[in-house]
Amino acid sequence: MTTIAIVDYGMGNLRSVAQALSTVAPDADVRISAQADEIRAADRVVLPGQGAMPDCMAAFDQSGLREAVLEAARTKPMLGVCVGEQMLLERSAEARAGEAFTAGLGLISGDVIRFDLDGRLQPDGSRYKVPQMGWNRVHQSRTHALWAGVPDQSYFYFVHSYYARPAHPDESVGETEYGVRFTCAIARDNIFATQFHPEKSAQAGLQIYRNFVHWKP
């Protein structure tokens, strides 16, 4: 039986992710876990996150799960979701007062920056709003096993003010337009991560989770 650990460090859409995974893999052992030994023992690991990056990283460091997650990132399929994607990079411009940046896990080279859309108009004449909140198309800029069965230009659900900017273009596998063309999906070796929420993205999102369950990087 496949065991999937959803990392519980106090920040993230845990139950919705667990429900989505249980839907596509009813025979899997899906666990929301705050235990390092369970994360190490799992076959696959999901790192969720929502809210502000500084809060997520502070909660993550306080959880005592850093080493277990870093070990998992080296040895088994890992999926980052929303702020969980941003946490994989080296640093984020979203920082607490008096700090220049928030350090990430450094598993993916690059940084996280804020939408700079002040005063910009959308094609329909309305102003862009930050955060981006709602459905948007995703262009599959590179082929990947987790895109299998997902039509290019499918809609996914986004809620975010910041986005990842990977240092290596070949690690960007999905892009979206919102005033600027930005990376919304990253992949390297056994890691795949999305800015959008697959668990809130209907059948296209469920297919991402289904592919993750069967992925053999």
UniProtKB/Swiss-Prot annotation:
Coiled-coil blocks: none
CDD domains, alphabetized: GATase1_IGP_Synthase
Transmembrane region(s): none
Domain Glutamine amidotransferase type-1: 3-217
Residues at the catalytic site: 82 (nucleophile), 197, 199
Classification via InterPro entries: Class_I_gatase-like, GATASE, Imidazole-glycPsynth_HisH
Record pathway: Amino-acid biosynthesis; L-histidine biosynthesis; L-histidine from 5-phospho-alpha-D-ribose 1-diphosphate: step 5/9
Catalytic activities: 5-[(5-phospho-1-deoxy-D-ribulos-1-ylimino)methylamino]-1-(5-phospho-beta-D-ribosyl)imidazole-4-carboxamide + L-glutamine = D-erythro-1-(imidazol-4-yl)glycerol 3-phosphate + 5-amino-1-(5-phospho-beta-D-ribosyl)imidazole-4-carboxamide + L-glutamate + H(+); L-glutamine + H2O = L-glutamate + NH4(+)
Main localization category: cytoplasm
Sorted UniProt keywords: Amino-acid biosynthesis, Cytoplasm, Glutamine amidotransferase, Histidine biosynthesis, Hydrolase, Lyase
GO terms under biological process: L-histidine biosynthetic process
Cellular component aspect of the GO annotation: cytoplasm
EC identifiers of the protein: 4.3.2.10, 3.5.1.2
SUPFAM superfamilies: Class I glutamine amidotransferase-like
Keyword Amino-acid biosynthesis found: yes
Location in or out of the cell: Cytoplasm
One Gene Ontology term of the molecular function aspect: lyase activity
Physiological role: IGPS catalyzes the conversion of PRFAR and glutamine to IGP, AICAR and glutamate. The HisH subunit catalyzes the hydrolysis of glutamine to glutamate and ammonia as part of the synthesis of IGP and AICAR. The resulting ammonia molecule is channeled to the active site of HisF.
Subunit structure: Heterodimer of HisH and HisF.
Name of this chain's protein: Imidazole glycerol phosphate synthase subunit HisH
Organism from which the protein derives: Ralstonia nicotianae (strain ATCC BAA-1114 / GMI1000)
Gene of this entry: hisH
